[in-house]
Amino acid sequence: MTDEAQPPLSLFIVAAEESGDALGAALVRALKARHGHALTLHGVGGRAMAAEGIASPFAIGGLSIMGVVAIPGRLPMIFRRIRQTADAVVAAHPDALVIIDSPDFTHRVARRVRQLAPTIPILDYVSPSVWAWRPGRARAMRAYIDQVLAILPFEPAMYDKLGGPPCRYVGHPLIERIAELRPNAEEAQRRREDPPVVLILPGSRNSEIRHLLGRFGAAIAQVAARSGPLELVLPTVPHLAAQVREAAAGWTIPPRVVVDPAEKWAAFRRARAALAASGTVTLELALAGIPTVAAYRMSPVEAFIILRLVRLLARLPSVILANLVLGENVIPEFLQSACTPDRLAAALLPLLSDTPQRRRQVEAFGRLDAIMAIGGEAPSDKAAAIVGEVAQQRGRHGPAALGRRRAFG
């Protein structure tokens, strides 16, 4: 359909932190490719979305609600921004609202918009982890979410099981960066050469560095004593670089600390193994084909609340994202009291040579292309198609029709 024949679409996109901002920018580019100039965009986001023409009414720094006990001082500002965002959506009255990740912020926006303007369709791009804890959220979302755009392949079945809103898998954003993760022939050869490159990935928050980096360093000392020389690369974010360098300066083998994303991905393509904090990075490592040991420690209060909720409410066999996608516990995980240098070293050492432990991970990671539908349409293109479909449906049927459909279900 040409721009002239296609009725203009009005969309409002909300992202509350940097990762969501990047997803929002990719979505906007895909929407522009599909709809050209027949598109009006509003939103709340960061620099990436601003570069695509979305002028946010305020900076999104500080909106991320992370941790269980560390945010009371920011709550008044956060709730003020929630009201401001919802009111801006209602004033724009778009054909669809797209909220991206950060559910503690974006879902409050969505609920307020549904109360104030119930005919605006709402899509949630990146599901909250209803499969990990508080699964009752899935059913509750039916009241204010019309479509979930999932980035993990097992999520649509989980929403169906939990009685949540319609959910469609569009693909993980890492799929669009797969070439950055995987080695060429020369880099693959470096993975087999000595000294082995080992990635150290202790997380991107101060608390993670504080709880993990010392234990990682002690584990590496044990591994080096038994394996011989290692080349260590520790990617981090700029605002933590000085803290990381100081903390790792006394290691038996000081790591090369890198903050440039290009250097990080170059190290991924050459690494033989990794020691990593639990999180999205475990899926990055799996897609890169790097055998990994994963660990996590947090404050005692957060551990009491989160780890028990995760295990008891959802009965998850693992908290490692790559394991959940694969459907088996391939990457060994060491959480809280189990996260000791001795255990980390014992799990990491076999990954440096041709052992059953290493082969099991490499073989499992080879199945990810099929599981995650890598090689087809880009995730941002799939997401843009669904967003456009929902928005155009509202345009064809009118807001009243959509409101009646939601009300009577």
Annotate each predicted stretch with a short phrase.
Residues M1-G409:
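Nucleotide-activated sugar donor-binding and catalytic core shared by glycosyltransferases
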